[in-house]
């Protein structure tokens, strides 16, 4: 029996997070306190919220000065995964934004600068993941919040082995999280129970005294 055959299949959920931008790695991003009007934010009116302008919805949002906006995909199974998609600035002028990908698994450096009136194609590398691992897209506004809004569209491609054909296992726009419930616990199969069931089904245990 191959234990890999009984690992949870590769699925996952999206989470929207934020954190102070200290210039270093974002280790424990925070959940947003409020989801209303289709977006996550830190107060009813983003213009006067505790973290001004910071908000995120299925189609895009706005960053906050010296804060990081984090799109997190939380794996619920095992395999290989990558984050891909694009992000585009929607307003003329404004300061540069910075973005990068990060993961709790080993991930080669992937980052870029998002200038005014520009867009970036995000094509993350393949990484080995197991249930509980995360892949993050992190957007920063180190030069202030005079940057206008943005649109985005991200997905997770997955495969169980390097030889397998990739498939889309998650899409941010169609699966955008509207609650902050903890991710479900993925359960592995029981190889011995499956073996007994297989033998029983094949009549190996069926006999008459």
Question: Where does each model-flagged region fall?
Answer:
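Short, structured secondary-structure elements
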Residues: 187-209
């Amino acid at each position: 029996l191959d234990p890999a055959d009984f690992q949870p299949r590769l699925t996952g959920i999206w989470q929207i997070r934020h954190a102070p931008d200290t210039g270093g790695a974002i280790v424990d991003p925070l959940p947003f306190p409020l989801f209303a009007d289709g977006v996550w934010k830190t107060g009813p009116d983003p213009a006067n919220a505790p973290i001004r302008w910071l908000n995120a919805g299925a189609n895009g949002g706005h960053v906050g000065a010296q804060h990081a906006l984090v799109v997190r995909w939380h794996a619920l199974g095992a395999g290989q995964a990558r984050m891909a998609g694009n992000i585009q600035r929607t307003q003329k002028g404004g300061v540069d934004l910075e973005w990068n990908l990060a993961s709790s698994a080993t991930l080669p450096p992937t980052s870029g600068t998002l200038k005014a009136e520009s867009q970036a194609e995000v094509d993350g590398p393949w990484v080995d993941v197991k249930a509980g691992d995360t892949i993050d897209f992190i957007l920063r506004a180190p030069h202030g919040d005079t940057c206008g809004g943005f649109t985005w569209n991200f997905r997770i491609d997955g495969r169980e082995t390097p030889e397998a054909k990739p498939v889309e296992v998650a899409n941010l726009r169609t699966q955008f999280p509207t609650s902050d419930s903890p991710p479900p616990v993925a359960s592995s199969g029981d190889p011995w129970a499956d073996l007994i069931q297989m033998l029983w089904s094949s009549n190996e245990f069926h006999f008459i005294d």
